[in-house]
């Protein structure tokens, strides 16, 4: 989810835009434990339980020599495990349903799939003492939580790609299908106070068509928007488990005339991932992204357009329960000398456009985010006070939409919400658009910075 810059971040919904950078997303002990930095230092290891089975298959006698074999050994009924592409093990008896409704924790009872592991080019800089320090950056639940959230994202988005995202579908049906899947696979419907904080949506599903680049979602009682075969659709949604948010996005186009646009942005995102890592500077990452993206052009209906990196929206770091931290990764050459550090989590995303490559706030509302620095102690409007209690009890710092409020049964909230926004207690986010008639695309992955390499936690077979 793209992030606005601090200069534009606390603006009112339709405040004037400046030429400053805007981040792309708004900020408002188990058997599944994993190590913080050791996975890449020592490699991901499998389960020793299969060693005896492998030995038997190779004709090696694994029985105690002094035991006389009197009966033919019965064939073991032990369920075999298969290795996933990432090298971890999973029981393969259970399969996901369509629509997805089987808990990911049921499908992977002992260990969640690991993301794409990419060692750094030079790992000699990491001493044993540094590795021990880095392993303490993350608690025991950090990797299991992140890997569970990533697997939920993969399964839900692949279902959406196959079954939901089709010409003629309403964007509301796509959004609800994605969000129902996330809640079902996480096991938390978020209907009781506090349940939303355990697992669920990391932010509202963004479904942005054509010149709308980011921050659009269906709202209640608005006219249905129908997906057309000539549209370019950006799908951006987040999944969290215990506040560990996986932020990943992709673009769908049914007409191959947009292929170069999608390829440019996908390759630019992968370039950003390639250059990301411990001690990498934001300026270097941005320059590399821009060079790759703007090497492409796309021909649409006989006219050739250069693909432009959108310059006032950025990638960002992710903090617990906060989709946006304090660091930004522009998609263009810049002077940002901030460095990435061990233990950090980043959303590496890029947006490309056939238009100006600059976004403005549009009319409408995408969602809301609680400003934790502002108290509601001086509120006078009773509806605003009541609404703020609902927000704090059910969403906290996680961005939410009007659909989420109505799902909780909240009614007649618009006046109270306006009061909260006017007092700076809640921030309202608008859709971000390029010029009409242009087309925009987005691809995004979440990465974890281990001491020995990076883990592209949201990587899948699709992108």
UniProtKB/Swiss-Prot annotation:
Its main location: cytoplasm. SUPFAM superfamilies: Creatinase/aminopeptidase, Winged helix' DNA-binding domain. Its cofactor is Co(2+); Zn(2+); Mn(2+); Fe(2+). Residues 46-57 have a biased composition (Acidic residues). A divalent metal cation 1 binds at residues 236, 247, 444. A divalent metal cation 2 binds at residues 247, 316, 349, 444. It is found in: Cytoplasm. Cotranslationally removes the N-terminal methionine from nascent proteins. The N-terminal methionine is often cleaved when the second residue in the primary sequence is small and uncharged (Met-Ala-, Cys, Gly, Pro, Ser, Thr, or Val). This is Methionine aminopeptidase 2-2.
């Amino acid at each position: 989810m793209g992030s606005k810059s601090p200069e534009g971040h606390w603006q009112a919904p339709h405040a004037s835009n400046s030429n400053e950078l805007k981040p792309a997303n708004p900020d408002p002990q188990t058997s599944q434990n994993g190590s913080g930095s050791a996975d890449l230092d020592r490699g991901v290891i499998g389960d020793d339980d299969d060693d005896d089975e492998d030995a038997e298959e190779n004709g090696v006698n694994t029985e105690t020599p002094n035991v006389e074999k009197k009966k033919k050994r019965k064939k073991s009924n032990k369920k075999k495990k298969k290795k996933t592409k990432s090298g971890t093990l999973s029981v393969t008896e259970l399969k996901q349903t369509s629509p997805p409704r089987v808990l990911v924790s049921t499908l992977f009872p002992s260990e969640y799939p690991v993301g794409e592991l990419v060692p750094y080019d030079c790992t000699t800089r990491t001493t044993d003492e540094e590795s021990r320090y880095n392993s303490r950056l993350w608690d025991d639940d950090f990797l299991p939580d992140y890997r569970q959230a990533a697997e939920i994202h993969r399964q839900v988005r692949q279902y959406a790609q196959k079954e939901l995202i089709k010409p003629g579908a309403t964007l509301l049906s796509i959004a609800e299908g994605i969000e129902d899947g996330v809640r079902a696979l996480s096991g938390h419907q978020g209907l009781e106070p506090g349940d939303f904080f355990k697992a669920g949506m990391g932010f509202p599903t963004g479904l942005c068509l054509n010149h709308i680049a980011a921050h659009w979602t269906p709202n209640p009682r608005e006219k249905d928007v129908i997906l057309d075969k000539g549209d370019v659709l950006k799908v951006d949604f987040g999944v969290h488990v215990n506040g560990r948010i996986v932020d990943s996005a992709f673009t769908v186009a049914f007409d191959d005339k947009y292929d170069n646009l999608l390829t440019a942005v996908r390759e630019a995102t992968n370039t950003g991932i390639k250059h990301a890592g411990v001690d990498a500077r934001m300026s270097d990452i941005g320059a590399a992204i821009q060079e790759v993206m703007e090497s492409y052009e796309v021909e649409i209906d006989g006219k050739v357009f250069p693909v432009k990196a959108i310059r006032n929206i950025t990638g960002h770091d992710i903090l617990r329960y906060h989709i946006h931290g304090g660091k930004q990764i522009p998609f263009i050459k810049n002077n940002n000398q901030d460095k990435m550090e061990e233990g950090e989590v980043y959303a590496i995303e890029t947006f490309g456009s056939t238009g100006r490559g600059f976004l403005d706030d549009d009319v409408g509302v995408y969602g809301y985010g609680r400003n934790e620095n502002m108290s509601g102690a001086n509120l006078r409007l009773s509806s605003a006070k009541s609404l703020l209690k609902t927000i704090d009890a059910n969403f906290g710092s996680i961005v939410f939409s009007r659909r989420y409020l109505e799902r909780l049964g909240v009614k007649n909230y618009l006046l109270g919400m306006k009061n909260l926004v006017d007092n700076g207690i809640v921030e309202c986010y608008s859709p971000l658009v390029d010029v009409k008639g242009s087309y925009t695309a987005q691809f995004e992955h979440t990465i974890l910075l281990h001491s020995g390499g990076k883990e592209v936690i949201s990587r899948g077979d699709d992108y």
